[in-house]
């Protein structure tokens, strides 16, 4: 069944443009509240958000919907996505909501939903919500005496800070480390520097002055250049770049080099395997992860299980097959011993623990493998189905034949933006570049002809 509202990470779009309108947000509140209004106890929902200007609008619309459906609402304010997942469980809420478009610009926003167990909702539940959204939603409203209440909750941000601190092994402190952190002017602008400082680090912070429109603006995990500059300026030992809702992380080593999610997963998997705490015999990643990671793990006797793109699918595979490390090249790192979704700060602490215990530099710890040449380009689309065009299909088949057994090709529509992503990797960088450029040209032509 086709999905009408939900993408790979909730509902997302440009603010005040369908589907990111106050009307739909209120309807989502009613629909979700109706589905989770089970049993005779008083039902509750927790709502967090990042620092986007439109967060105020969507927050109030969701509150109207949930209270109209008979749920009490706890408003957490600006707080990371993994904190919402954690507090949904901790506060025994029926549902958790994060208002965020993650790494997207401020003009976008989104609604992510978590079940009472702290995990993102299944495809089946999202389809059930979509079905309700297209019906007479107002027939589901609570009786007058059962309308919910809403209140702002103070102090839960500190509960999350304490949770994060407990994920660092007790025999490790961060004393002696100078850490530069970029909070992307987003949800972690308070919690991340506080947690690192309380663990003993000297902390230099950028991207911690949100104004509603500067989230992810030339900062954060998708724009690490500002962090690289600051790291050199203050001679930090490590740089940590979070995204707008802090569920992904990118590291910058002491030389100013980028360490992506694939390398971070390699570090954690290698460390946990040595400690006999790695489960599943390997890790879970998506089709976008580098072939070099797969080869590195294979040399260690570990496996790489691949899923389609989206951390929710990584988590689903982890749960079904008893893995405890998974993630994405983009920096979503899921460590199920600690949480139910990607947590940039928790992942960074695992790397810092390895650095402190080994006495090595960040570059020595984090350069686990040589990435296979990989190139990713995006083709923006406004409609049509260029991937069903016969000429495009033939070009894809030719590209796969050219790579043969020496590389991989991944072509997929983005689940969060109107893009088609074209990725190829292989040992021959010139061949990879030609394949990607040729395919981008063919898809662009098919798009124009549609």
Swiss-Prot record:
Catalytic reactions of this protein: alpha-D-glucosamine 1-phosphate = D-glucosamine 6-phosphate
Pfam families on file: PGM_PMM_I, PGM_PMM_II, PGM_PMM_III, PGM_PMM_IV
GO molecular function, one term: magnesium ion binding
Keyword set, alphabetical order: Isomerase, Magnesium, Metal-binding, Phosphoprotein
Gene3D superfamilies: Alpha-D-Glucose-1,6-Bisphosphate, subunit A, domain 3, Alpha-D-phosphohexomutase, C-terminal domain
PTM annotation (Phosphoserine): residues: 102
Positions that bind Mg(2+): 102, 243, 245, 247
Location of the active site: 102 (phosphoserine intermediate)
Cofactor: Mg(2+)
Post-translational modifications: Activated by phosphorylation.
PROSITE patterns: PGM_PMM
Any GO BP: peptidoglycan biosynthetic process
CDD domains, A to Z: GlmM
Keyword presence, NAD: no
Family annotation (SUPFAM superfamilies): Phosphoglucomutase, C-terminal domain, Phosphoglucomutase, first 3 domains
Transmembrane domains' residue ranges: none
EC class name: isomerase
PANTHER family the record matches: PHOSPHOGLUCOMUTASE (ALPHA-D-GLUCOSE-1,6-BISPHOSPHATE-DEPENDENT) (PTHR42946:SF1), PHOSPHOHEXOSE MUTASE (PTHR42946)
Function: Catalyzes the conversion of glucosamine-6-phosphate to glucosamine-1-phosphate.
Full protein name: Phosphoglucosamine mutase
Organism this protein belongs to: Agrobacterium fabrum (strain C58 / ATCC 33970)
Name of the gene this protein is made from: glmM
